[in-house]
Amino acid sequence: MRKFDKSIAAFEEAQDLMPGGVNSPVRAFKSVGMNPLFMERGKGSKVYDIDGNEYIDYVLSWGPLIHGHANDRVVEALKAVAERGTSFGAPTEIENKLAKLVIERVPSIEIVRMVNSGTEATMSALRLARGYTGRNKILKFIGCYHGHGDSLLIKAGSGVATLGLPDSPGVPEGVAKNTITVAYNDLESVKYAFEQFGDDIACVIVEPVAGNMGVVPPQPGFLEGLREVTEQNGALLIFDEVMTGFRVAYNCGQGYYGVTPDLTCLGKVIGGGLPVGAYGGKAEIMRQVAPSGPIYQAGTLSGNPLAMAAGYETLVQLTPESYVEFERKAEMLEAGLRKAAEKHGIPHHINRAGSMIGIFFTDEPVINYDAAKSSNLQFFAAYYREMVEQGVFLPPSQFEGLFLSTVHSDADIEATIAAAEIAMSKLKA
């Protein structure tokens, strides 16, 4: 049995200092029934907690570390920038360099604005969509997470396509009424919503691959249908690629699926592990953002040289060949997990998009949030705890996916499959 004495003590102290002892809720490990692991360091595909335990890491800071921990080029770039100054409140050339890379690789982006988080990116994109179209309502999908902006912390009302209800205390009902929620992968509900509210829908915001109900790819024709419906009704299509951007493909989710939105939100990978976000799109739309246009958005540390340098060094190391290797390694892990579950007769469904993998402990195909909720959460929690014992660090939630990096080796994947085999053999009874 591994020992976690130092993590337990650190969490006890943290609970007097921060809400729930953490700075983001999922880090409390509540849904898996254990104390959080306090990490000390990471290198490559491994992380090490403060008790000295080593893990193969599939969290990767929730996706940004596509080259693993402490990538040499990223670390050297950060050292060089920090020695010259961490932020100036004035433009720097590294902003241009990262912006050029983003524009070259993301089909929808002609102009990009850097911000400090994915939440900032989505909030700003919604304001831009409303300002550009002169409309008030947005349409989002149940179970898709777009950050913690008030307009996006909305749950479904009753009926097929309804005005939303607040999903957190502190979100005014008046804000919620401008958000329409429908089921992910349900194009007919989207069409119905436009029949009811079309003249006032500014945009549809969607993750090309839903990543916060586990990993749920789009059904064939779904993204294409959204593109068609929004164009027909004069609404903008926004892809939230904070998670999928440069993760599922060289040209992001939109390149992977061949559908080009009007606006795209980015984060995670483009910061190389530092706080970052971005939104961009057609020049005609983006020129409405201040100071070139009337739609306001600003940020003290937006485009700061540390994040820009880390992002630039991260992206320049990604090539089309990187994603060929991602596919090979992800297929290997997916097949191994499936074989282990089948061997022990454990109900399961595995979804994958590029280097994102989600395993659900259910017999039901998972194409939306309702299906994801059919998973056996108690089994997942037990599986999670056993995988920790076997030295594998997974996201501590059934509704989060695994991420691969360029530095995960075949040996890492083989060890992970072996760990899953042991875990499932212990839990099958």
Swiss-Prot record:
One example GO MF annotation: transaminase activity
Family: Belongs to the class-III pyridoxal-phosphate-dependent aminotransferase family. HemL subfamily.
Pfam families in alphabetical order: Aminotran_3
Record's catalysed reaction(s): (S)-4-amino-5-oxopentanoate = 5-aminolevulinate
Alphabetically ordered keywords of this record: Cytoplasm, Isomerase, Porphyrin biosynthesis, Pyridoxal phosphate
Residue(s) carrying N6-(pyridoxal phosphate)lysine: K268
Quaternary data: Homodimer.
CDD domains per the UniProt record, alphabetical: OAT_like
Protein name, per record: Glutamate-1-semialdehyde 2,1-aminomutase 2
GO cellular component, one term: cytoplasm
Pathway noted in the entry: Porphyrin-containing compound metabolism; protoporphyrin-IX biosynthesis; 5-aminolevulinate from L-glutamyl-tRNA(Glu): step 2/2
Gene name per UniProt: hemL2
Principal place of residence: cytoplasm
Subcellular localization: Cytoplasm
Originating species: Bacillus anthracis
Cofactor(s) listed in the protein's UniProt record: pyridoxal 5'-phosphate
UniProt enzyme class: isomerase
PROSITE patterns in alphabetical order: AA_TRANSFER_CLASS_3 (PS00600)
Enzyme Commission designation: 5.4.3.8
Record-level GO BP terms: protoporphyrinogen IX biosynthetic process
PANTHER family: GLUTAMATE-1-SEMIALDEHYDE 2,1-AMINOMUTASE (PTHR43713), GLUTAMATE-1-SEMIALDEHYDE 2,1-AMINOMUTASE 1, CHLOROPLASTIC-RELATED (PTHR43713:SF3)
UniProt keyword Cytoplasm, yes or no: yes
Family annotation (HAMAP family): HemL_aminotrans_3 (MF_00375)
Cited InterPro entries: 4pyrrol_synth_GluAld_NH2Trfase, Aminotrans_3, Aminotrans_3_PPA_site, PyrdxlP-dep_Trfase, PyrdxlP-dep_Trfase_major, PyrdxlP-dep_Trfase_small
